[in-house]
Amino acid sequence: MEFSTQTTASLHQIKTAALAVGVFADGVLSAAAEVIDRASHGAVAAVVKSEFRGRTGGTLVLRSLAGVSAQRVVLVGLGKQAEYNARAHASAEQAFAAACVAAQVGEGVSTLAGVAIEGVPVRARARSAAIAAGAAAYHYDATFGKANRDARPRLKKIVQVVDRAASAQTQLGLREGAAIAHGMELTRTLGNLPGNVCTPAYLGNTAKKLAREFKSLKVEVLERKQVEALGMGSFLSVARGSEEPLRFIVLRHAGKPAKKDKAGPVVLVGKGITFDAGGISLKPAATMDEMKYDMCGAASVLGTFRALAELELPLDVVGLIAACENLPSGKANKPGDVVTSMSGQTIEILNTDAEGRLVLCDALTYAERFKPAAVIDIATLTGACVVALGNVNSGLFSKDDALADALLAASRQSLDPAWRLPLDDAYQDQLKSNFADIANIGGPPAGAVTAACFLSRFTKAYPWAHLDIAGTAWRGGKDKGATGRPVPLLMQYLLDQAG
């Protein structure tokens, strides 16, 4: 999608397929809605009084209003005026874009970013507007037959009407939001593709395609022999159960930071299990199809790299993706097996369905060579995190308060929420093994915490945080599909680090 700005005092003269104006739940019209109301001789106020309640995200389309050039005026609910905030604004922008999609129009004009929010600058409002619109306009049809693909017109452009003084900051925010939306689109599509299409090799080829598109990106894709030479015994043990060959993907964004005495790069590590049947510890059949989403950590790394490369962010960033399948076979891991990780630590595999940590631990050890300023791993790691936090907050684990605080601040600003969970040393006792340095599970209690504790054993050399996105990377049910999270959180963190 494209986003741009327009400055005008004559909203009623704008020629567009759809014009969005905000209405609060208490019947108060936004400044833009008042302009359209006057031009239409009170038509907006009359509708608001009789049938439009202005609830957050609600819409009502008015066609061919007298005195207004727009083909459609879309009334968008902003909720209660006293409670209007950044999240309500994002919901309104997404609702407008969804209304445009439903009306099959290719472009629209929004006045919503111009509605002031205390403590939220126009740049941030514009950024969230673009992200929200991109989410509403997303459409998946990659695996439909030609006859069943949706051929309706796509929403391609939204223009934000702003004051002249706010135009530059709005344009900057829209540019940032558009890049994040494009990254989320890639992340969602990779997640939604089936496991027989989105294989480890497919992820590697996607990374190479990004490097061809963006000059700031360099990509190296390692295969089995190279991974064996590195001594990644834990990662290899998971991959051994599948006929699909593994890939270890290394992405580098050379951002040319302004600081000469710069710290090392930020490293993003993504879990890339392109299908997880659980291995010998086989998962139940019900909803196993959703285990194609077990690579959403890897997908979010690729989506984030697409966004930061589009923005040419002045920050050095490295991405690491350990990609393979976790399937049962005669060569698969067995409960009780002991494997040696790249770090030299031995691991007793008590449950082969706790495989994400087995591939991540070697990637986290590999990250040491970059002398990173910070390492953040992203993984659909535990069902226990879903039990704890549901589908709203991603789980955040870190012993580094500064890194955790920066990520939490980014989560709030990006409207991509995370919640910090404990990482106390006392939980490490659950991972004791009689036969190896560490067990790969710690029993039912505090499953998300002990999974993070396991990973922490491989992160002593740098500041580290773990994002468990098992509850937030995709939705189930009738709206089943990948969400694109936590690309907004990660990009906001990187934007903050770049200054």
Swiss-Prot record:
Cofactor note: Binds 2 manganese ions per subunit.
GO cellular component, one term: cytoplasm
The protein's enzyme class: hydrolase
Catalytic residues as annotated in Swiss-Prot or TrEMBL: K283, R357
GO molecular function: manganese ion binding; metalloaminopeptidase activity
Record-listed E.C. numbers: 3.4.11.1, 3.4.11.10
Pfam families: Peptidase_M17 (PF00883), Peptidase_M17_N (PF02789)
UniProt record, GO biological process: proteolysis
Cofactor(s) needed by this chain: Mn(2+)
Keyword Manganese in annotation: yes
Organism domain of life: Bacteria
UniProt binding sites for Mn(2+) 2: K271, D276, D294, E355
Subcellular location(s) per record: Cytoplasm
Catalytic activity reported: Release of an N-terminal amino acid, Xaa-|-Yaa-, in which Xaa is preferably Leu, but may be other amino acids including Pro although not Arg or Lys, and Yaa may be Pro. Amino acid amides and methyl esters are also readily hydrolyzed, but rates on arylamides are exceedingly low; Release of an N-terminal amino acid, preferentially leucine, but not glutamic or aspartic acids
SUPFAM superfamilies found in the cross-reference section: Macro domain-like, Zn-dependent exopeptidases
Residues engaged in binding Mn(2+) 1: D276, D353, E355
Alphabetized InterPro entries for the sequence: Leucine_aapep/pepB, Macro_dom-like, Peptidase_M17_C, Peptidase_M17_leu_NH2_pept, Peptidase_M17_N
Keywords of this entry: Aminopeptidase, Cytoplasm, Hydrolase, Manganese, Metal-binding, Protease
Family: Belongs to the peptidase M17 family.
Chain's role: Presumably involved in the processing and regular turnover of intracellular proteins. Catalyzes the removal of unsubstituted N-terminal amino acids from various peptides.
Protein name per UniProt: Probable cytosol aminopeptidase
The organism of origin for this protein: Bordetella parapertussis (strain 12822 / ATCC BAA-587 / NCTC 13253)
